[in-house]
């Protein structure tokens, strides 16, 4: 079952500077997709379009049956927001509230109940328990990233989008995140994250979508025998 369908999407910042051109991509429910591309390929631009940050686009995409296109009504935009959650590489958070209050606040925006018990359990897994009542302004970059990731894992939006999600995380936290990410997908969620780390995508993703020359050139199912490095450099033409 498809959770996200991107059809013929072109994106620009100025009309004479097209970043993406006629992009097509389909994400299935319950899978992890890695979005790969060299620096400047347009990974963040595509994510910003899917999350509503950038509205200079043509074509359309459909998320959970809700069709999005340029100039869509505010009601449609609001509906889309409740079906996705976005974690940026350098999160912008309300710094003068506590981590727990932030997670609770985001739940209220999504009109979902906040479970202190589930939050406490997840915080323990991330070795974050002693920070839950600290102001976000007092947290390191890595711990701020944990707040964003825990929020997404608890919300269970149908689509969880991440842009370089490992920034600031230690090795143990990365392993915890990927374990929880798998549980998220087993429960029916879909994850799309951009990365320039081939080894990370190879290990943790079900599919890799390679963005090059303004388009998704190839979507590769990842298995034990997949040589993602070879596949990637065959597409971009050099190593």
UniProtKB/Swiss-Prot annotation:
PROSITE patterns: ABC_TRANSPORTER_2 (PS50893). It comes from the Bacteria. Induction: Transcription is highly induced by oxygen limitation and is under dual and independent control of Spo0A-AbrB and ResDE. Residues 4-238 form the ABC transporter domain. Keywords: ATP-binding, Bacteriocin immunity, Bacteriocin transport, Nucleotide-binding, Protein transport, Transport. One of its GO terms (biological process) is bacteriocin immunity. Changing residue 57 to Y: In strain: ATCC 6633. InterPro entries: ABC_transporter-like_ATP-bd, ABC_Transporter_VariousFunc, P-loop_NTPase. ATP binds at residues 37-44. One of its GO terms (molecular function) is ATP hydrolysis activity. Pfam families: ABC_tran. Belongs to the ABC transporter superfamily. Involved in the production of the bacteriocin subtilosin. Required for immunity to subtilosin. This is Putative ABC transporter ATP-binding protein AlbC. The lineage of its organism: Bacteria, Bacillati, Bacillota, Bacilli, Bacillales.
């Amino acid at each position: 079952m498809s959770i996200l369908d991107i059809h013929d999407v072109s994106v620009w910042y100025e009309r004479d500077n097209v970043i993406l051109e006629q992009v097509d991509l389909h994400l299935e429910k319950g899978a992890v997709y890695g979005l790969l591309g060299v620096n400047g390929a347009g990974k963040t631009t595509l994510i910003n379009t899917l999350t509503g940050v950038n509205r200079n686009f043509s074509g359309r995409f459909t998320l959970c049956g809700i069709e999005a296109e340029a100039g869509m009504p505010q009601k449609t935009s609001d509906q889309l927001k409740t079906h996705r959650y976005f974690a940026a590489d350098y999160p912008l958070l309300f710094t003068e509230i506590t981590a727990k209050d932030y997670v609770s606040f985001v739940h209220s925006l999504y009109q979902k109940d906040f479970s202190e018990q589930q939050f406490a359990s997840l915080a323990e897994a991330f070795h974050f328990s002693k920070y839950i009542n600290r102001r976000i302004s007092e947290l390191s970059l890595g711990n701020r990233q944990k707040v964003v990731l825990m929020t997404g894992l608890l919300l269970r939006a149908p689509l969880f989008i991440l842009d370089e999600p490992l920034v600031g995380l230690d090795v143990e936290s990365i392993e915890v995140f990927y374990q929880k990410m798998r549980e998220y997908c087993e429960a029916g969620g879909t994850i799309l994250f951009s990365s320039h780390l081939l080894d990370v995508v190879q290990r943790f993703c079900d599919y890799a979508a390679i963005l090059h020359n303004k388009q998704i050139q190839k979507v590769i199912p990842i298995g034990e025998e997949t040589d993602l490095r070879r596949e990637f450099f065959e597409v971009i033409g050099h190593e």
